[in-house]
Amino acid sequence: MGSQKRLVQRVERKLEQTVGDAFARIFGGSIVPQEVEALLRREAADGIQSLQGNRLLAPNEYIITLGVHDFEKLGADPELKSTGFARDLADYIQEQGWQTYGDVVVRFEQSSNLHTGQFRARGTVNPDVETHPPVIDCARPQSNHAFGAEPGVAPMSDNSSYRGGQGQGRPDEYYDDRYARPQEDPRGGPDPQGGSDPRGGYPPETGGYPPQPGYPRPRHPDQGDYPEQIGYPDQGGYPEQRGYPEQRGYPDQRGYQDQGRGYPDQGQGGYPPPYEQRPPVSPGPAAGYGAPGYDQGYRQSGGYGPSPGGGQPGYGGYGEYGRGPARHEEGSYVPSGPPGPPEQRPAYPDQGGYDQGYQQGATTYGRQDYGGGADYTRYTESPRVPGYAPQGGGYAEPAGRDYDYGQSGAPDYGQPAPGGYSGYGQGGYGSAGTSVTLQLDDGSGRTYQLREGSNIIGRGQDAQFRLPDTGVSRRHLEIRWDGQVALLADLNSTNGTTVNNAPVQEWQLADGDVIRLGHSEIIVRMH
């Protein structure tokens, strides 16, 4: 009988809609508020769902679809207010003894398929609905995934008139399959700024900020998309700042050893030519960051001090992989003396960089008496000519050093690395953190990924993972996650919490644990 009754109601409603559309097409006319109220009440009655305990659940979100002309007149008609319709419909639902999960919300949207005087209404059960007070900010068409299962579900609104529990009803019964409606976005259309660039790239122009080296030229709001900038090279960007490469500041000071020249011998001053420009390298002191450009500046014996002939530059371990520290007995070790020509070496492996001044023995900081008088080599295992460290030390010395933290070979923090910084954060301490996902085992597919700190699970508005289950307290349990350990704690809930069918107050979660609260089950997944 119930199915026959619904069929008859459906046929009657279809006939009413057909007749009403025909009159609207022929005679036109405006929308009458009483007709809208009647349609909303009929939609609420048609959307009733039966729950356990002889309770009836009505939709709480209603979308009224109007033609374009009627939609534009909404702001001028004070009787066509979504808040007024929602208030009247909520009173009607309460009078009928029905329940809703969430506040009753009425929204308007437009459709180009409807003529003047035609309108449609549809109702859905949406626990995540939020009230939008402005009428003109009408609801945009619902997307197919608006209420789908997403990690970190936003707080749901709560209906204060909802009394009593829903029993064993599955939470996914609240989700209506009518969310997937045709999308008719009133704000759709081409991008108003999608036109061509009126400037046509970057012709010379006056006014505004002048084209500054190092910063993009000023753009008009209607200029168009970013690709028209033609990238940084054509802007003159950082390269034309005459940036860091040929600063010749620290290198041409000859570290701190040639302090007689000091800063006045910084060469061109300011920010020298770009990395791409490679001015000739003087055969004198090493250019460090400068003369040969970006790559050679790091692979020549630059840095804070010049590399004596044959000396090992930069992070010594990078330069000659596997070679032990140079000793002053060796012929290639020159403790002091005039700097030789820059030594051309391949890119990064022999980078001179910052370490040069700390590895050249007496050649660095020497003439300023920073290292000439004191024996800083006592921090390594071999006495050397005074200086900060024996040549070839540095971070990347791969074998047998007393500062490689007990490893006999190249540093290995999870994968082979040529030394020093390149192995950091890979393996060892774990390059990727563990994540914990809670999966609601009710067929809805809802999941929630734990955030670091407190994660509240319950039925209330302040819960990060809300469950539409009246057997669940508003603040039922808390899971604290610190990136390594997930600790569950029951928050004095009414019906309690079980993990793997065992009642718990506190519990350290593991992969595969099954949390039961109210009539809901949550499976813990650790990745």
UniProtKB/Swiss-Prot annotation:
This is FHA domain-containing protein FhaA. GO terms for cellular component: cytosol; peptidoglycan-based cell wall. The structure of the N-terminal domain remains unchanged upon phosphorylation. Phosphorylated by PknB. It comes from Mycobacterium tuberculosis (strain ATCC 25618 / H37Rv). Keywords: Cytoplasm, Phosphoprotein. The gene is fhaA. Residues 199-209, 256-266, 284-299, 345-366 have a biased composition (Low complexity). Its main location: cytoplasm. SMART domains: FHA. The modification Phosphothreonine is found at T116. Residues 170-188 have a biased composition (Basic and acidic residues).
